């Protein structure tokens, strides 16, 4: 309700009572209208004031309705939003974000919260990520002012170097998982709570079950035939005593995965890489036609890396280096920095068209540079920094009057495979620390291989390597050929943006395959309040997609 202001109503009443009657301002003509007696004037004045009170009451009522409607509209638009003054967890699984916040309430670090949240997302959005996949952390330590990257993406097994990959699913598509090693290294360096404690919420969730969410339900429907045809997948994702997939809000359980998580929680990461879980991984992947060995698991290491950092409009962007999508994201923002975009840049249809044309062209040129980027032979970012330094010269190549349908016009020399789905998580802790992490099993449900012993769904990351034989217009990128221990190129771009005082201004990333880079670029531009729409352009499809926000 809106409280009436007596003073305002009194003022309105006085103005009405002191006003001359309407007829007093018109010259009276006795032949037209006879003069009124004083009682009639009083009656007329009373009726006029009565009408004004009614009008005021109606206007106030309308104002109340409008206010209520506006408030309801605000809540409808942001029904899933949660606002926090000192800390926050943003994930694509609502119950998982709550787990992350609870971990921080228990005095857990931002990394503790990230690990606990990711374990949960591996259940809630089991089609996108899980312990059978890999990830990239970007971590900010506010006390030291340092940012680091932990790369635990999947690597090619030692027996895969001479194979030409022709499948995007099944055993041959499975790379060596790195998720758990990534958790372990991040926890070793930045954890505060006991390792075991981070697993408890997800173990409970896996055992007790939870309703199928919208994202998982859509993935199940989209892949209905493959799920229902697989005994191991149907064991979890189908209704009891039926081979029909679960629907949104149906209860889902992961009892075997709960046992696996308990073992990793109690024994540690070696249970996965050098223990009973590892034994089952090798056995099951082999039965599915894959090549992972015990030695592959034992030799796997997560890498601590130096991030790429670029300054854009006074902010510093930190992203992973190659072979992630970070260098392309940095290059895009440096190209666009020179245009000095502002709200004025999208104030009219004509200006908006020009602004988005420039953005799309920047996307194309930046993705072309990505295809020419060499595979890093060391953790030195020299080659990447050389690529980013081309921003000014690339901007000069962008024409405001035309585009080009010839892909060689943009300088692309080879094609990289399109990546599958992912899951992203952003965290800011009360102490100012931050985590941006993207995790994936690559395609939806990864390789479509699930162990009926451990409950692990395995990735299909081998599909992200370039094939030697390719029928595309351009040759495959040789720097992305499969080699033992190599990580494939990726669009994953978990980013952290700091201001000049080293305060976190944005923790950002995305899921959605190759659109990760362009979506993250536009969200980063939004930090500078430059645009209010998200625009995607996946070079080189030449079909931009626009989403208002």
What are these regions (language model features)?
Residues 14-16, 20-102, 106-267, 272-324, ...:
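Noncatalytic scaffold domains of N-terminal-nucleophile
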Residues 111-118, 196-207, 275, 279-282, ...:
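Short, well-structured alpha-helical segments that form the helix of a local strand-helix-strand
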Residues 304, 419-422, 444, 490-492:
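Short, small/polar residue-rich loop motifs at catalytic or cofactor-binding pockets
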């Amino acid at each position: 309700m809106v409280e009436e202001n007596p003073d305002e109503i009194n003022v309105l009443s006085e103005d009405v009572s002191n006003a001359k009657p309407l007829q007093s301002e018109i010259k009276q003509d006795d032949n037209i209208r006879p003069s009124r007696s004083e009682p009639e004037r009083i009656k007329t004045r009373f009726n006029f004031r009565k009408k004004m009170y009614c009008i005021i009451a109606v206007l106030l009522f309308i104002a109340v309705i409008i206010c209520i409607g506006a408030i309801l509209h605000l809540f409808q638009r942001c029904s899933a939003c949660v606002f926090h003054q000192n800390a926050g967890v943003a994930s694509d699984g609502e119950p998982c974000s709550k787990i992350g916040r609870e971990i921080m309430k228990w005095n857990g670090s931002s990394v503790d919260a990230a690990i606990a949240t990711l374990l949960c997302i591996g259940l809630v959005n089991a089609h996108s990520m899980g312990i059978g996949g890999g990830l990239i952390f970007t971590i900010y330590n506010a006390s030291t002012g340092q940012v680091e990257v932990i790369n635990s993406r999947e690597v090619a097994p030692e027996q895969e170097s001479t194979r030409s990959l022709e499948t995007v699913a099944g055993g041959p598509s499975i790379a060596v998982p790195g998720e758990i090693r990534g958790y372990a290294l991040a926890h070793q360096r930045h954890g505060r709570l006991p390792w075991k404690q981070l697993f408890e919420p997800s173990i409970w969730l896996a055992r007790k079950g939870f309703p199928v969410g919208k994202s998982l339900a859509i993935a199940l429907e989209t892949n209905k035939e493959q799920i229902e045809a697989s005994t191991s997948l149907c064991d979890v994702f189908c209704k009891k005593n039926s081979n029909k997939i679960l629907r949104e809000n149906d209860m889902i359980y992961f009892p075997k995965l709960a046992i696996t998580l308990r073992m990793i929680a109690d024994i540690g990461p070696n249970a996965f890489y050098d223990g009973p879980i590892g034994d089952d991984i090798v056995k099951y992947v082999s039965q599915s036609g894959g090549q992972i060995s015990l030695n592959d698991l034992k030799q796997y290491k997560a890498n601590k890396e130096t991030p790429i950092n670029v300054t854009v409009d006074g902010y510093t962007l930190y992203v992973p280096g190659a072979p992630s999508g970070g260098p392309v994201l940095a290059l895009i923002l440096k190209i666009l920095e020179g245009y000095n975009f502002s709200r004025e840049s999208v104030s009219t249809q004509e200006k908006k068209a020009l602004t988005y044309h420039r953005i799309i062209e920047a996307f194309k040129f930046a993705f072309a540079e990505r295809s020419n980027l060499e595979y890093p032979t060391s953790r030195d970012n020299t080659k990447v920094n050389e690529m980013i330094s081309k921003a000014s010269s690339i901007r000069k190549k962008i024409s405001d009057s035309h585009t080009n349908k010839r892909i060689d016009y943009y300088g692309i020399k080879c094609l990289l495979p399109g990546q599958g789905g992912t899951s992203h998580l952003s965290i800011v802790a009360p102490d100012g620390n931050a985590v941006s992490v993207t995790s994936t099993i690559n395609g939806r449900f990864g390789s479509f291989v699930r162990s009926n012993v451990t409950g692990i769904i395995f990735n299909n990351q081998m599909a992200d390597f370039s094939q030697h034989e390719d029928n595309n217009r351009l040759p495959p990128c040789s720097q992305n050929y499969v080699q033992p221990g190599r990580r494939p190129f990726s669009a994953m771009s978990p980013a952290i943006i700091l201001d000049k005082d080293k305060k976190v201004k944005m923790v950002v990333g995305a899921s959605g395959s190759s659109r990760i880079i362009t979506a993250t670029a536009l969200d980063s531009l939004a930090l500078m309040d430059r645009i209010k729409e998200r625009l995607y352009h996946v070079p080189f499809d030449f079909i931009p997609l626009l989403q208002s926000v």
